[in-house]
Amino acid sequence: MKFDPEKIKKDAKENFDHAWNEGKKMVKTPTLNERYPRTTLRYGKAHPVYDTIQKLREAYMRMGFEEMMNPLIVDEKEVHKQFGSEALAVLDRCFYLAGLPRPNVGISDERIAQITEILGDIGEEGIDKIRKELHAYKKGKIEGDDLVPEISAALEVSDALVADMIDRVFPEFKELIPQASTKTLRSHMTSGWFISLGALLEREEPPFQFFSIDRCFRREQQEDASRLMTYYSASCVIMDEDVTVDHGKAVSEGLLSQFGFEKFLFRPDEKRSKYYVPDTQTEVFAFHPKLVGSNSKYSDGWIEVATFGIYSPTALAEYDIPYPVMNLGLGVERLAMILHDAPDVRSLTYPQIPQYSEWEMSDSGLAKQVFVDRMPETPEGQEIASAVVAQCELHGEEPSPCEFPAWEGEVCGRKVKVSVIEPEENTKLCGPAAFNEVVAYQGDILGIPNNKKWQKAFENHSARAGIRFIEAFAAQAAREIEEAAMSGADEHIVRIRIVKVPSEVNLKIGATAQRYITGKNKKIDIRGPVFTSVKAEFE
């Protein structure tokens, strides 16, 4: 909290030790629910795929490549030009774009009656306005998402009524079936490179070195641990009169060495795609130390990571490109799986989707989900709670019956004396579980004593909820005393006995933690004999 520096300097000159010790009063005492680890500074994290993309961008640029964005939507005729006789096989794996046709809607007398019933009497002029707007929509002058607002503005009626009118009067809009176009979503980055390079030659002369990292789409039969229907391709091209296969090898090593790969093996690719010159299509295998001994088929450290080749003159000629072009491509997700030690591309890409990944919640995360339910709402109430805890710490082992005054003052306009009591004989002021602390340990949430048996559980301070049973009970007692003061009671006693569930000691566990613990077959074990009471006497 804020303080007066001049007063502090004056007090320090008079009595330095006293002023120094008084400094504790300047530091706010957090409430139980404000304590660490519930008070935390969150930080953002990059998605592993986007993190890998950024690293690839930097790696390419360090090698002197310039970034380019290639067309994502490619007409099927481009695929025929690039792939020749392979085009149909390639198109079989492409997603075609489709759109809803725009119906030619008529307005009969029956429909006019329905419109009038919904919108009221808008007259012939209003019907004509609807006709004009529908005609403009049919001609493409109005976009689909603007049709309702346009009719609404023309008729000066609400959007909701117009939407209801279209839904009930014009069923044609609900019966529309998408019609496929000849445009596809790019399945290979190559589809975009031919278009970009052909256009660029009209304005610039090679040599060129470009890279592009962007989405591609493939109509796979199904997605599995190693393939998705949409993925990122990190592709580059070198256009130069003297470019050779060796440039592909050099780029492979230069790029992949920046990601920890140490050895390289180049093998002719058996696929022999028609857009590459025969015998230039090459698979790149690389050795990465992180893979050695892993639980994967790459435990020997070797993995196929890229493919390169020289574009075929027959494909380049379709775009009037007279220069050789070396192209290299690699899947970003495969590289990300190596860098982030991920066994499944689905869980790597979509970790938020339960069907793709195991839910893992840290002990620290579980501890953040433990809260005190009822808290005092006044400064005096907070003082009462602290005083109750202090008396229990001082006299918890005292034999009963016993009573210890804890706090005296005014609460909600009424004077009150607060004591910690244990009226029963042959016991103690506090039961043996009173000072148990809530800790998350190995996926469980436990209420346990801080002793040698549980030393391992208490070593991780970020997994300690920072709440003892007696503190949670004292908070409840203080809140009840505040309520008793406002209700006009003369006396109020708050008791706690054997705790069997968190709510009996004024604790609540967040719903997220409860779902996690239930799903993982873990446990919430907060129980034990607390046995103490707090008495408030009002004047």
Curated annotation (Swiss-Prot):
<dbReference type="InterPro" id="IPR045864">
    <property type="entry name" value="aa-tRNA-synth_II/BPL/LPL"/>
</dbReference>
<feature type="binding site">
    <location>
        <position position="327"/>
    </location>
    <ligand>
        <name>substrate</name>
    </ligand>
</feature>
<feature type="binding site">
    <location>
        <begin position="275"/>
        <end position="276"/>
    </location>
    <ligand>
        <name>substrate</name>
    </ligand>
</feature>
<comment type="subunit">
    <text>Homotetramer. Interacts with SepCysS.</text>
</comment>
<dbReference type="InterPro" id="IPR005246">
    <property type="entry name" value="O-Pseryl-tRNA(Cys)_ligase"/>
</dbReference>
<dbReference type="Pfam" id="PF18006">
    <property type="entry name" value="SepRS_C"/>
</dbReference>
<dbReference type="InterPro" id="IPR002319">
    <property type="entry name" value="Phenylalanyl-tRNA_Synthase"/>
</dbReference>
<dbReference type="GO" id="GO:0000049">
    <property type="term" value="F:tRNA binding"/>
</dbReference>
<keyword id="KW-0067">ATP-binding</keyword>
<comment type="similarity">
    <text>Belongs to the class-II aminoacyl-tRNA synthetase family. O-phosphoseryl-tRNA(Cys) synthetase subfamily.</text>
</comment>
<dbReference type="GO" id="GO:0005524">
    <property type="term" value="F:ATP binding"/>
</dbReference>
<feature type="binding site">
    <location>
        <begin position="188"/>
        <end position="190"/>
    </location>
    <ligand>
        <name>substrate</name>
    </ligand>
</feature>
<keyword id="KW-0648">Protein biosynthesis</keyword>
<comment type="function">
    <text>Catalyzes the attachment of O-phosphoserine (Sep) to tRNA(Cys).</text>
</comment>
<dbReference type="GO" id="GO:0043816">
    <property type="term" value="F:phosphoserine-tRNA(Cys) ligase activity"/>
</dbReference>
<dbReference type="Pfam" id="PF01409">
    <property type="entry name" value="tRNA-synt_2d"/>
</dbReference>
<dbReference type="GO" id="GO:0006412">
    <property type="term" value="P:translation"/>
</dbReference>
<keyword id="KW-0547">Nucleotide-binding</keyword>
<feature type="binding site">
    <location>
        <begin position="233"/>
        <end position="235"/>
    </location>
    <ligand>
        <name>substrate</name>
    </ligand>
</feature>
<protein>
    <recommendedName>
        <fullName>O-phosphoserine--tRNA(Cys) ligase</fullName>
        <ecNumber>6.1.1.27</ecNumber>
    </recommendedName>
</protein>
<keyword id="KW-0030">Aminoacyl-tRNA synthetase</keyword>
<dbReference type="InterPro" id="IPR006195">
    <property type="entry name" value="aa-tRNA-synth_II"/>
</dbReference>
<dbReference type="GO" id="GO:0043039">
    <property type="term" value="P:tRNA aminoacylation"/>
</dbReference>
<dbReference type="InterPro" id="IPR041590">
    <property type="entry name" value="SepRS_C"/>
</dbReference>
<keyword id="KW-0436">Ligase</keyword>
